[in-house]
């Protein structure tokens, strides 16, 4: 079982966002990333402590910046399961007012909507009702759709897990293959399953492997480091194009683009 604590950075203005981005750029310029020297670790902690320390967010529950806690487990047998926990308010009079309780797994419908042919029309209806947002990867999966619970209480993983339904349409510059991919890769199950990991080449599930040998760089997935000449094949019946990834490079490019933009241009763009 593994767990990840995901925090919210409370950067409330454009200048706050740019200043926070500059802190990460300064860290990169000041230190080589490996090996992690004491100076690097101290500099890194000066960036993360203001976000993760107790009381870092006085206006939030328990004064915490925690956004969600996510766990992955495969205790007895397959499937691998991911769950999400958020700080939730307890009834008045409870000894602790806000505690971590299980929540829905965001952006991820229940797997039955792709695995059960009788329920696939519900997934198809949601996707085809939100084609423009899915094409732009700006959609938000709702808790319910067509009068029934839609969001998953847990995300199940098999080596080729993905979301698909017959009748998915295209929109604008996005083919039906693009629409299916954009929707599925943004789910927990697809990103850690068949949409971003090739079971023929890649270790299952993890993008950052917890069992890397001590004293050596952590093992990262090809989704992060780059797929090179072996793109991730489409796992769905659409049999679409293979997809190339290099997400660490994408994030670095996004950071540089942000730093080069400036607040005036960001304000005009918004």
What are these regions (language model features)?
Residues 185-195:
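The canonical Cys-X-X-Cys-His
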Residues 10, 131, 170, 184-187:
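Secretory pathway export signals and precursors
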Residues 147-175:
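Short, charged low-complexity linear segments at domain edges
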Residues 177-183:
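Short, flexible, mixed-charge glycine/proline-rich loop motifs
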Residues 198-220:
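Gly/Gly-Pro-rich "capping" loops immediately C-terminal to redox-active cysteine motifs
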């Amino acid at each position: 079982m593994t767990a990840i604590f995901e925090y919210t950075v409370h950067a409330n203005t454009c200048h706050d966002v740019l200043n926070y981005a500059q802190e990460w750029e300064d860290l990169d310029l000041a230190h080589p990333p490996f090996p992690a020297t004491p100076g690097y670790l101290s500099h890194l902690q000066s960036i993360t402590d203001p976000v993760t320390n107790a009381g870092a967010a006085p206006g939030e529950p328990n004064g915490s910046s925690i956004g969600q806690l996510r766990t992955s487990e495969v205790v007895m047998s397959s499937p691998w399961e991911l769950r999400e926990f958020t700080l939730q308010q307890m009834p008045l009079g409870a000894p602790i007012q806000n505690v971590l309780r299980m929540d829905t797994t965001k952006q991820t419908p229940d797997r039955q909507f792709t695995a059960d042919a009788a329920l696939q029309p519900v997934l198809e209806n949601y996707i085809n009702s939100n084609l423009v947002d899915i094409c732009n990867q700006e959609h938000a999966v709702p808790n319910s759709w067509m009068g029934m619970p839609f969001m998953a209480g847990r995300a199940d993983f098999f080596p080729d897990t993905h979301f698909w339904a017959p009748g998915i349409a295209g929109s604008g510059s996005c083919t039906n293959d693009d629409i299916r991919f954009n929707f599925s890769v943004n789910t927990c199950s697809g990103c850690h399953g068949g949409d971003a990991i090739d079971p023929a080449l890649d270790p299952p599930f993890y993008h950052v492997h917890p069992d890397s040998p001590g004293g050596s760089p952590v093992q990262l997935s090809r989704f992060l480091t780059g797929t090179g000449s072996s793109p991730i094949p489409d796992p769905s019946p659409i049999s679409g194009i293979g997809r190339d990834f290099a997400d660490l490079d994408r994030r670095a490019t996004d950071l540089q683009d942000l730093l080069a933009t400036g607040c005036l241009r960001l304000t005009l763009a918004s």
